[in-house]
């Protein structure tokens, strides 16, 4: 039987197995024991099956949170793929639709038959394709977040874009809250932004890509994205969870929108933060976004004010880069709270195939965005050379100023 395997964390006051069996039946054929033998035989291939139950010890922390004593278990349930079409809405409604309303169930993972998941696109470009576009293959990429643009005009945008590029960043992304407006129209951001970055390229020989925020009403997005591709957009930033995973997939699969897509995690916090219910970050921000076609995925770093736990962040990165999957690897982009002094930690945790993404850590540098970018580049070079940041800072004024402002986290070899 071809089946999607769902792994859950279940809580129940009395009988975990009974609850698990109820889920398996309730999300497939509805009932079993009351059916005549002939109907059972006809429906057997559609029946969900509890495959494994691993009981966990009782947790006082869990009991205190829910205000009652609960049993806990990791449960695996197989859902026959014959029951649903190969699309993400059908998958999500089957495995966690009404179940998400339970409040005491957490969806930890989904495992797919190979022939089923091959019906999904995965990233069009992925890590290798993005590296080819930037021309950088031997280090983490550096990205700057375009902050403070609301209420500004195109002249300000192009000026600030040049500064960030002159600092040596590989990519600049719009802020996710920058929408189409009279002051900063979408198409003009693309054309004026490209012209500004071309000037910097001619001056320095360094290529910088600009991720423009694709926004608007859902049914207008495809035409807008096609126009962006026609205008030569480098990358499309997309607030995927405001629209839906299926919309991301539709953008990825359209051959007239052959532009890398950067998935932003805005609104994912409504689904992932609790350890007791909702959806695990490695699935929601990792496996499913890669399946749907994101080339880059932003997610909270373990270091900032909106931090994920380190193992959760690493789990997202593993899901995005797992070589066993039949898709291109997607770029992990740990974000929030990043400054040059954290670069040793970022590279230790996420390796070279990651993107160092900073907003305030670049724009808040004493020498502005140019100094901020140079400080990050110096920090990356130092780590790759095996040098402590403080030693490298003695020879690099921009890095020294960054360390003076934000400090440094050295990592032992």
UniProtKB/Swiss-Prot annotation:
Catalyzes the enolization of 2,3-diketo-5-methylthiopentyl-1-phosphate (DK-MTP-1-P) into 2-hydroxy-3-keto-5-methylthiopentenyl-1-phosphate (HK-MTPenyl-1-P). Binds 1 Mg(2+) ion per subunit. Belongs to the RuBisCO large chain family. Type IV subfamily. The keyword rRNA processing does not apply. Has no RuBP-carboxylation activity. It is an enzyme of class 5 (isomerase). It catalyses: 5-methylsulfanyl-2,3-dioxopentyl phosphate = 2-hydroxy-5-methylsulfanyl-3-oxopent-1-enyl phosphate. Pathway: Amino-acid biosynthesis; L-methionine biosynthesis via salvage pathway; L-methionine from S-methyl-5-thio-alpha-D-ribose 1-phosphate: step 3/6. Its cofactor is Mg(2+). Changing residue 98 to A: Loss of enolase activity. It holds the Pfam family RuBisCO_large_N. Substrate binds at residues 147, 173-176, 264, 337, 359-360. Keywords: Amino-acid biosynthesis, Isomerase, Magnesium, Metal-binding, Methionine biosynthesis. This is 2,3-diketo-5-methylthiopentyl-1-phosphate enolase. Its EC number is 5.3.2.5. The keyword ATP-binding does not apply. PANTHER family: RIBULOSE BISPHOSPHATE CARBOXYLASE, RIBULOSE BISPHOSPHATE CARBOXYLASE LARGE CHAIN. HAMAP family: Salvage_MtnW. It comes from Geobacillus kaustophilus (strain HTA426). It comes from the Bacteria. GO terms for molecular function: 2,3-diketo-5-methylthiopentyl-1-phosphate enolase activity; magnesium ion binding; ribulose-bisphosphate carboxylase activity. Changing residue 173 to A: Same activity as the wild-type. SUPFAM superfamilies: RuBisCo, C-terminal domain, RuBisCO, large subunit, small (N-terminal) domain. InterPro entries: Diketo-Methiopentyl-P_enolase (IPR017717), RuBisCO (IPR033966), RuBisCO_lsu_C (IPR000685), RuBisCO_lsu_C_sf (IPR036376), RuBisCO_lsu_fd_N (IPR017443), RuBisCO_lsu_N_sf (IPR036422). Mg(2+) binds at residues 173, 175-176. The active site is at residue 98. GO terms for biological process: carbon fixation; L-methionine salvage from methylthioadenosine.
